[in-house]
Amino acid sequence: MRLLHTMLRVGDLQRSIDFYTKVLGMKLLRTSENPEYKYSLAFVGYGPETEEAVIELTYNWGVDKYELGTAYGHIALSVDNAAEACEKIRQNGGNVTREAGPVKGGTTVIAFVEDPDGYKIELIEEKDAGRGLGN
């Protein structure tokens, strides 16, 4: 068993694709349209779906905003340097909501950003994080 994807409902599919690809450095892996049920999908990630978990962006036609509620927490991404990643995100128009610094009660360096729909994304500093944002 392995994790395949996390689905996020978005109010503007192209805006979300732009954020995840241009701001966070992911690749657009595939898209699909379902006119019968009036929704569109886009899958984004740092590697192929056959090897890594990805994010499914779901746009339900005509719905431009969702209530996020209080149950959802965040998605976490590893970065080589959280402060540099925040600066890069800011330069690309992203919203940094918590600057890089140690997690409360610990030493791991983290930061938080929000996507255009308000979903929180944690950046966790891990040296040699691999490919993707901050690398």
Swiss-Prot record:
It comes from Escherichia coli (strain K12). Disruption phenotype: Deletion of the gene increases the HOCl sensitivity. Mutant is more sensitive to methylglyoxal treatment. This is Lactoylglutathione lyase. Coiled coil: none annotated. Belongs to the glyoxalase I family. Catalyzes the isomerization of the hemithioacetal formed spontaneously from methylglyoxal and glutathione, to S-lactoylglutathione, which is then hydrolyzed by a type II glyoxalase (GloB or GloC). Is involved in methylglyoxal (MG) detoxification. Involved in resistance to hypochlorous acid (HOCl), which is the active component of household bleach and a powerful antimicrobial during the innate immune response. Its EC number is 4.4.1.5. It catalyses: (R)-S-lactoylglutathione = methylglyoxal + glutathione. Gene3D superfamilies: 2,3-Dihydroxybiphenyl 1,2-Dioxygenase, domain 1. Pathway: Secondary metabolite metabolism; methylglyoxal degradation; (R)-lactate from methylglyoxal: step 1/2. Induction: Repressed by NemR. Induced by reactive electrophilic species (RES) such as quinones, glyoxals and methylglyoxal. Up-regulated by HOCl.
